[in-house]
Amino acid sequence: MRYGFTTGSCAAAASKAAAYMLLTGKKKETISIVTPKGIVFETKLLDITRKEKSVSCAVEKDGGDDPDITTGALVYAEVSYTERSKTFHTETSLQTETKALHATIEIDGGIGVGRVTRPGMDQPVGNAAINHVPRQMIEAEVLEVCRMADYKGALKVIISIPKGVELAEKTFNPR
């Protein structure tokens, strides 16, 4: 059986790649991360866009031999320089490390990423519906790049799945 990778893994890989290209100015064609299960995920980067203060790129979701509705969708990450927010709180286990590094990573959802609408979910009402494990993965990968580039400022990561709006209409939770 051929393994696929989660949407969260795709988001983390795209985030790492966009952060790398932003902080180093170098282009990447592929990127690899290690998933929480210890599996190396190497993937090709698509639709790379550079702006003055941000870089975005996409990773194509591959569901392997057990595909779901998101298989084939492009998962985008845009990483940009931002000001530190006094109200921002990542809610991850990496908070202590983040403070020690003096780097701040803010994670939000863009087009095609739902918002939490009811209490009791993994994230507070109003937040992007990106659960804590993918958030931890994204933060860890971006922090790794920050350490490598000796960057101690603030970065904002926006995860988008343009096809997500269309895909959500085919599920039990179209919001």
Where are these regions (language model features)?
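Generic N-terminal targeting/processing segments that precede catalytic cores or assembly contacts
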Residues: 1-175
